[in-house]
Amino acid sequence: MGCNPPYLLSYRLRLLLLFTLCLTVLGWATSNYFVGAIQVIPRAKNFMATLHKVMYLGNEETLGHGAAMKKAELANCPSVSPNLRGQNKLVFKPDLTLEEVQAKNPKVSRGRYRPEECKALQRVAVLIPHRNREKHLIYLLEHLHPFLQRQQLDYGIYVIHQTGSKKFNRAKLLNVGYLEALKEENWDCFIFHDVDLVPENDFNLYTCGDQPKHLVVGRNSTGYRLRYSKYFGGVTALSREQFFKVNGFSNNYWGWGGEDDDLRLRVELHKMKISRPKPDVGKYTMIFHTRDKGNEVNGSRMKLLQQMSRVWKTDGLSSCSYRLLSVEHNPLYANITVDFWTAA
């Protein structure tokens, strides 16, 4: 009388088995979902890491794993370094050698330096056009390396040497420097630097901003006054994007003069405004020299300036042809030697 009928017990048993089976399937599906989700996260992280390496041209790999981890842990350097001294009295020893300068800069290797105490805010390439100015180069390197180190910059110095006896082409050498330097590092900022100008005040920051910068407000040879109101020569700073936007310098200025004004016109054409440091900061010493043979005044410079607005798109980085003879990494700088087989 008190027992359940056999068919009722069988029904309840089947229901219990079905419920247990559903729970098992649900648990298995949920487990696989979370395992799959966990596996996706490392793949996403790996993708972002790979993208970062591509953006920075594999720079972390060149440091090695330990150094890369150490760099990642560093805090950013301040916008104004605490190591700056301000106005510096420059001394040029007549018998100074490159080996002496090298001994004073043991942390510079292959022309490269980065601060150990913090992560630099910008990677800066200094481009120096050069021919037959070995003594000037030694003097500039002697003062420029500690100058840049006090500013806590991640920097590299490139000397672009024009071989042969054809007329000197400063602008084209700087285009070459830009193109070749980018093969080694995705530089943020480029400093286009004459070899005979040495900065006196390290508050004159060798960094790039939202607008192109002209760093030579005055020099000893002009009584520390600007040469003329729209002067844009000597030492200038443009970001990678700014220089690319204006298609770099013209390649057609053979001999002395005009190429800086051409670059200024390109900058103005693109609605960019040139900034300068304060006069007591943007001070330089020009090392005296006579005009070099092969760097005579360019008699065509005014005509070329008048053509700028018509030719800037086709005359510049996009048309810079040269024969690369060598790239040598000396302790204090990278030396890029090129030959220009045509001249105006």
Swiss-Prot record:
Pathway(s) the chain acts in: Protein modification; protein glycosylation; Glycolipid biosynthesis
Binding-site residues for Mn(2+), renumbered to this chain: D196, H289
All ranges on the Lumenal side of the membrane: 39-344
Reaction(s) the record says it catalyses: N-acetyl-D-glucosamine + UDP-alpha-D-galactose = beta-D-galactosyl-(1->4)-N-acetyl-D-glucosamine + UDP + H(+); a beta-D-GlcNAc-(1->3)-beta-D-Gal-(1->4)-beta-D-Glc-(1<->1)-Cer(d18:1(4E)) + UDP-alpha-D-galactose = a neolactoside nLc4Cer(d18:1(4E)) + UDP + H(+); 3-O-{beta-D-galactosyl-(1->3)-[6-O-sulfo-N-acetyl-beta-D-glucosaminyl-(1->6)]-N-acetyl-alpha-D-galactosaminyl}-L-seryl-[protein] + UDP-alpha-D-galactose = 3-O-{beta-D-galactosyl-(1->3)-[beta-D-galactosyl-(1->4)-6-O-sulfo-N-acetyl-beta-D-glucosaminyl-(1->6)]-N-acetyl-alpha-D-galactosaminyl}-L-seryl-[protein] + UDP + H(+); 3-O-{beta-D-galactosyl-(1->3)-[6-O-sulfo-N-acetyl-beta-D-glucosaminyl-(1->6)]-N-acetyl-alpha-D-galactosaminyl}-L-threonyl-[protein] + UDP-alpha-D-galactose = 3-O-{beta-D-galactosyl-(1->3)-[beta-D-galactosyl-(1->4)-6-O-sulfo-N-acetyl-beta-D-glucosaminyl-(1->6)]-N-acetyl-alpha-D-galactosaminyl}-L-threonyl-[protein] + UDP + H(+)
Cytoplasmic side: 1-12
InterPro entries documented for this protein: Galactosyl_T (IPR003859), Galactosyl_T_C (IPR027791), Galactosyl_T_N (IPR027995), Nucleotide-diphossugar_trans (IPR029044)
EC code(s) of this entry: 2.4.1.-, 2.4.1.275, 2.4.1.90
Annotated binding of UDP-alpha-D-galactose, by residue: 129-133, 168-170, 195-196, 224, 256, 289-291
CC per GO annotation: extracellular region; Golgi apparatus; Golgi membrane
Cofactor or coenzyme needed: Mn(2+)
One of the GO biological process terms: protein glycosylation
Disulfide bonds: C77-C118, C189-C208
Glycosylated residues (UniProt): N220, N335
Bilayer disposition of the protein: Single-pass type II membrane protein
Binding site for N-acetyl-D-glucosamine: G258, E259, D260, D261, R301
Function: Galactose (Gal) transferase involved in the synthesis of terminal N-acetyllactosamine (LacNac) unit present on glycan chains of glycoproteins and glycosphingolipids. Catalyzes the transfer of Gal residue via a beta1->4 linkage from UDP-Gal to the non-reducing terminal N-acetyl glucosamine 6-O-sulfate (6-O-sulfoGlcNAc) in the linearly growing chain of both N- and O-linked keratan sulfate proteoglycans.
Quaternary structure note: Interacts with SLC35A2/UGT1.
Name assigned to this protein: Beta-1,4-galactosyltransferase 4
Organism: Rattus norvegicus
Lineage, uppermost ranks: Eukaryota, Metazoa, Chordata, Craniata, Vertebrata
Gene that this polypeptide is encoded by: B4galt4
